C-alpha cells in the first residue's frame, strides 16, 4: 500500500513482463530454426538475452531481498542461495563481453540479419515514438558496429525486441511503460498509479 514500494515492485514486475515476453518469442524461434529468419533471430537474441538477463539478475535478487528485509536475508529463504549463485550465470558458457561479441559477429556474418530485424519489428512501428526513435538509432549504429559499442548495441537490441513483443501482445499501458523504462534517453520516469496497479495485479495473479 506504500506508494514508494509500489513503484519498486511494479518496476520489478515490468522487467519480468518484458523478459518473459521476449523469451517466449525466442523459444518459438528455436523451435523453427529450419526457417532462415527464425535461425537468425535465435542466433542474435540468445546471446543478447543471456547478457542482459544475467547482468540484471544480481541487482534484481538483491532488490527482492531488500523488499523482504531480514526474512529475505535468512537462509530459510530461497533468495540468499539465488543471490550467491546468480553471478555464475554471467560466467557459465561465456562472460558478458563474449555474449556481446557473439551478437556483433552474428550481425557481421549472417546475411540478412538487419533485414530480418526490420521485418520482425515492422508490425509495431508507429505505435510508440520512443521505440521508433531507438530503433532508428540502433540501425544506424549497427550498420558499422565497433567492438567498443558491443554492450550498448546488445542491450539496446534486447530492449527493443522486448518492446516489440509487448507492443504486439501486452496491454498498451504495459508496453508504453516498458518503452519509457528502457528506451527513453532522458532517464526513467515514474509509473502511473494505474500502471502500477495493473502490473502488481498481474504479478500476484489477480
Question: In which residue ranges do the predicted regions lie?
Answer:
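Flavin-dependent oxidoreductase catalytic core characteristic
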Residues: 1-206
Amino acid at each position: 500500500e506504500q506508494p514508494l514500494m509500489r513503484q519498486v515492485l511494479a518496476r520489478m514486475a515490468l522487467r519480468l513482463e518484458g523478459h518473459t515476453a521476449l523469451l517466449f518469442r525466442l523459444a518459438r524461434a528455436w523451435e523453427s530454426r529450419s526457417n532462415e529468419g527464425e535461425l537468425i533471430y535465435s542466433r542474435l537474441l540468445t546471446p543478447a538475452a543471456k547478457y542482459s538477463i544475467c547482468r540484471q539478475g544480481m541487482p534484481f535478487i538483491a532488490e527482492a531481498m531488500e523488499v523482504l528485509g531480514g526474512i529475505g536475508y535468512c537462509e530459510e529463504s530461497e533468495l540468499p542461495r539465488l543471490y550467491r549463485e546468480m553471478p555464475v550465470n554471467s560466467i557459465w558458457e561465456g562472460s558478458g563481453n563474449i555474449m556481446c561479441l557473439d551478437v556483433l559477429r552474428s550481425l557481421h556474418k549472417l546475411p540478412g540479419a538487419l533485414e530480418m530485424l526490420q521485418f520482425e519489428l515492422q508490425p509495431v512501428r508507429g505505435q510508440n515514438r520512443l521505440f521508433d526513435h531507438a530503433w532508428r538509432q540502433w540501425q544506424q549504429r549497427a550498420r558499422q558496429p565497433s567492438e567498443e559499442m558491443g554492450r550498448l548495441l546488445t542491450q539496446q537490441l534486447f530492449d527493443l525486441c522486448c518492446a516489440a513483443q509487448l507492443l504486439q501482445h501486452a496491454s498498451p499501458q504495459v508496453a508504453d511503460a516498458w518503452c519509457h523504462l528502457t528506451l527513453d534517453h532522458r532517464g526513467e520516469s515514474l509509473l502511473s498509479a494505474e500502471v502500477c496497479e495493473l502490473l502488481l495485479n498481474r504479478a500476484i495473479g489477480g
